[in-house]
């Protein structure tokens, strides 16, 4: 018999941290090759929605609300796997990315390479159409 989502989350042994007055944890999404696509925060509610639907939901601290990845752009993330870090305050998701992950039009949000000698950044990768 399958457990309900609240029981699943309880069994994950997570430690939601107080971030900007909300109980959140860090969520990292990668593609099937391990390339980092993005990081965002998750609330217990967004984690619950992610488990229930099989698609990534996050918590936006700037908009103070839950959001489904791709709800406006169509660039959704279907969950393949999830891993918990050793402290229980971060989750690593392997996802099937439709379109690009970054709201700036890049596959990854990590497209600004920093030169540690100057602090200046260079864009790596191409914008996707």
Swiss-Prot record:
Catalytic activity: 1-(5-phospho-beta-D-ribosyl)-5'-AMP + H2O = 1-(5-phospho-beta-D-ribosyl)-5-[(5-phospho-beta-D-ribosylamino)methylideneamino]imidazole-4-carboxamide
Zinc is among the record's keywords: yes
Domain of life: Archaea
Requisite cofactors: Mg(2+); Zn(2+)
Principal localisation: cytoplasm
Residue ranges that the Swiss-Prot or TrEMBL entry lists as coiled coil: none
Biological process according to GO: L-histidine biosynthetic process
Keyword Membrane annotated: no
Self-association state and partner proteins as the record states: Homodimer.
Protein name (record): Phosphoribosyl-AMP cyclohydrolase
Species whose genome carries this gene: Methanococcus maripaludis (strain C6 / ATCC BAA-1332)
Gene that encodes the chain: hisI
């Amino acid at each position: 018999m399958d457990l309900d989502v609240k029981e699943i989350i309880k069994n994950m042994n997570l430690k939601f941290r107080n971030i900007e007055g909300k109980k959140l944890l860090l969520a990292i999404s990668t593609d099937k090759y391990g390339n980092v696509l993005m990081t965002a925060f998750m609330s217990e509610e967004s984690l619950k929605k992610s488990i229930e639907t099989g698609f990534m939901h996050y918590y936006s601290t700037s908009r103070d609300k839950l959001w489904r990845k791709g709800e406006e752009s169509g660039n959704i993330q279907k969950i393949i796997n999830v891993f918990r870090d050793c402290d229980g305050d971060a989750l690593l998701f392997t996802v099937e990315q439709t379109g690009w992950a970054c709201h700036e039009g890049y596959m990854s949000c990590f497209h600004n390479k920093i030169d540690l000698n100057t602090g200046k950044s260079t864009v790596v990768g191409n914008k996707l159409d």
